[in-house]
């Protein structure tokens, strides 16, 4: 049975992520009756949304309905390419980010994170847990001090229910639920303001799903993180 929850956000608080009149179309070349034609697939049709600090938006729909495309577009993981048409506007806080180049967008990347569906495929098997989390701290936050990085990793591992003493181990040494905790920790070690949760429990057993959902709720409460939850 669904449980009633207290709201963690202020309805009159600051806007974190805003999308206005978003349209996303993928153009694919197909061959019909010996001729090349362009097939246009409208994945997202005129969507607008506005999320406050600490708010959660759930997006539910069948496979192929554009849920992930919408979420990844807000994170600038789907960009305008030769076969992709994107229109509309995206704001992060008061900054208009939809027209930024990759280089201009880089300062925003650590504040906007994603937790993927499959904890087995989303982690690099060649990196230890420490290296997986350290990567973002070095690349996104440019933290050069090793002790500072280690302190952040130990803190977030404790927060997600992982033993810091296991940080030298590799993903294959953990269960599915533990791997998803690692993936969540990888995002939250950067202290993001907005996280896209792309079916984060669908690959897990039912008993583990509840534990992960409880963890995500607690992290949201602690950090006032804004979520889009795709299911």
Feature names for model-found ranges:
Residues 33-36, 96-113, 139:
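ABC ATPase NBD coupling module
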Residues 127-139:
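Q-loop/switch helix immediately C-terminal to the Walker
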Residues 170-174, 178:
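Conserved ABC ATPase signature
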Residues 189-193:
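A short, proline-enriched helix->beta-strand linker immediately N-terminal to the Walker B motif
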Residues 92, 96, 147-165:
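Conserved ABC ATPase "signature" region
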Residues 184, 212:
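Hydrophobic anchor residue at the start of the ABC signature
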């Amino acid at each position: 049975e669904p449980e009633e929850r207290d709201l963690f956000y202020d309805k009159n608080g600051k806007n974190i992520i805003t999308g206005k009149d978003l349209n996303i179309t993928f153009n694919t070349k197909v061959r019909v009756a010996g001729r090349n034609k362009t097939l246009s697939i409208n994945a997202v049709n005129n969507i607008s949304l506005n999320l406050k600090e600490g708010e959660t938006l759930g997006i539910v729909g069948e496979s192929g309905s554009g849920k992930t495309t919408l979420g990844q577009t807000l994170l600038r993981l789907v960009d305008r390419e030769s076969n992709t048409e994107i229109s509309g506007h995206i704001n992060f806080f008061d900054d208009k980010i939809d027209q930024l180049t990759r280089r201009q967008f880089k300062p925003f990347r650590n504040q906007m994170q994603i937790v993927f569906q499959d904890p087995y495929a989303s982690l690099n098997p060649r990196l230890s847990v420490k290296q997986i989390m350290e990567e973002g701290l070095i690349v996104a936050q440019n933290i050069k001090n090793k002790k500072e990085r280690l302190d952040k990793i130990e803190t977030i591992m404790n927060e997600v229910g992982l033993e810091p003493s296991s940080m030298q181990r590799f993903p294959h040494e953990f269960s599915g639920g533990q791997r998803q905790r690692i993936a969540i920790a990888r995002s939250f070690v950067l202290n993001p303001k907005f996280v896209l949760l792309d079916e984060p429990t669908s690959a897990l057993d039912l008993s583990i799903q509840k534990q992960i959902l409880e963890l995500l709720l607690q992290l949201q409460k602690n950090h006032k993180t804004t979520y889009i939850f795709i299911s």
